[in-house]
């Protein structure tokens, strides 16, 4: 992803990372380990009008075509998917005595998406490359991770990614 490459060498990025803890498994689009935080990004390339609430199981995607036709389809609430991924990552970290805050961001990468979402203040959603890059550069975790712990976390996920 171009945006993430703009961050610099101090950020370690894993893409399409399969994670598993006990019976729970998922694939993370992007896992970023920065000098101060650990972040999961769920990337969606949906276009049209997306509406939903943080607590809904499903969101609605509505598309309007040039000929005036419209379609409406349901999509799984991506916030729920991210929370599940975060819980798996946190379980992996705790099992390795690496308790660490894990943040999540939902990123809609299409230039033709319009979001109508009812979210918590703590839900991070970006709908442009510029917005995502700004978030990544300015985000301050509730508790800054120490360098030694982040190095161990990098090593742990490197090993997972290689296997």
Regions found by a protein language model. Name each.
Residues 1-26, 32-38, 44-52, 60-163:
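Surface-exposed interaction regions that form or flank ligand-binding interfaces
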């Amino acid at each position: 992803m171009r945006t993430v490459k703009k961050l610099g060498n101090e950020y370690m990025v894993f893409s399409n990372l399969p994670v598993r803890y006990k019976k729970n498994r998922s694939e993370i689009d992007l896992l970023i380990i920065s000098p101060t935080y650990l972040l999961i990004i769920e990337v969606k390339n949906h276009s049209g009008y997306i509406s939903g609430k943080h607590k809904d199981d499903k969101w609605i995607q509505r598309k309007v075509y040039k000929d005036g036709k419209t379609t409406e389809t349901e999509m799984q609430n991506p916030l729920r998917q991210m929370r599940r991924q975060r819980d798996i990552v946190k379980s992996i970290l705790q099992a390795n005595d690496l308790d660490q805050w894990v943040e999540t961001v939902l990123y809609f990468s299409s230039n033709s998406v319009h979001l109508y979402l009812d979210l918590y203040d703590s839900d991070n959603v970006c709908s442009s490359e510029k917005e995502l890059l700004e978030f990544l550069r300015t985000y301050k975790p509730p508790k800054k991770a120490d360098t030694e712990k982040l190095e161990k976390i990098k090593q742990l996920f490197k090993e997972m990614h290689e296997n």
